[in-house]
């Protein structure tokens, strides 16, 4: 059925000389690792009411009086540590992914990249697809696990700028077999040179209140335990989706429950975020005698500040101070051939929704 839908869509596209547009969305990055550029980026990012979900006046005070006077200088130094000759890793790898997905999908498709914050903007990406005479639009935010602060915010921006009459959205893929297989292959490739004592799956954290607002009916569950398997009562719970992704990858790797764990990084501010925290989890692992640790970041399909600096540098340094022998960070999927094919397959699969 799906193959017939894809075939019909391709015939229609060719007949009308119209392409199918694919919009890949990532979070965004500063234009350069300078204080002014980081300040511009953070101002746009943190002013989003879906990111800091408090009354507008309170948000303005937090952003303009508590964060922007101080954080840009610190963050710029962190970006400088990971900046590539070609530019921001997030942008470089995202563009590489866009290009290779386009090559894989072929001439009947046009693939564009839009950043929720910074450049290239979602509006710019949509204009490119319109100029390419695309008449159908597939939107794929590169956030495997759904959350209001990433996926919902990106989709809200798309709908505000979109002029396509036919649009389908892939709003999550945390349990998509092609994604899980891509992650598993990536890990297997790194196991050839390193055999860890333990696997840690580290995800971007969120304030706990975001889970409540997302409609998770298990938001008052015991956060010290693993989330329950995905069901109608927690299908929009970001934390539950992270645990489900980890379970699926661990199953593919034949890991026992004692061989891996899940933690959350990148917390900001004083509000309570979902636990356990990655930095504190490292302390617990060291107390258990773990020496060789492999860290995987499934919520980041593209390498960025949170993977390369927060884990690759800061967590690495922390692990050494804790007398750990080795902390190996698995690279993000970036433009891995299997991941490129996975995105192409997800895009084609979504055509049956038109």
From Swiss-Prot:
InterPro entries: Ferrochelatase (IPR001015), Ferrochelatase_AS (IPR019772), Ferrochelatase_C (IPR033644), Ferrochelatase_N (IPR033659)
Xref: HAMAP family: Ferrochelatase
GO molecular function: ferrochelatase activity; metal ion binding
PANTHER family for this protein: FERROCHELATASE, FERROCHELATASE, MITOCHONDRIAL
Recorded GO CC terms: cytoplasm
Keyword annotations of the record: Cytoplasm, Heme biosynthesis, Iron, Lyase, Metal-binding, Porphyrin biosynthesis
Metabolic or biological pathway: Porphyrin-containing compound metabolism; protoheme biosynthesis; protoheme from protoporphyrin-IX: step 1/1
Location of this chain's protein in the cell: Cytoplasm
Family: Belongs to the ferrochelatase family.
Protein name (record): Ferrochelatase
EC top class, as a word: lyase
Catalytic activities: heme b + 2 H(+) = protoporphyrin IX + Fe(2+)
Source species of the chain: Coxiella burnetii (strain RSA 493 / Nine Mile phase I)
Chief location category: cytoplasm
A GO biological-process term: heme biosynthetic process
Pfam family, one: Ferrochelatase
Biological role stated in the UniProt entry: Catalyzes the ferrous insertion into protoporphyrin IX.
EC number: 4.98.1.1
The gene coding this protein: hemH
NCBIfam families xrefs: hemH (TIGR00109)
Residues at which Fe cation binds: 204, 306
Source superkingdom: Bacteria
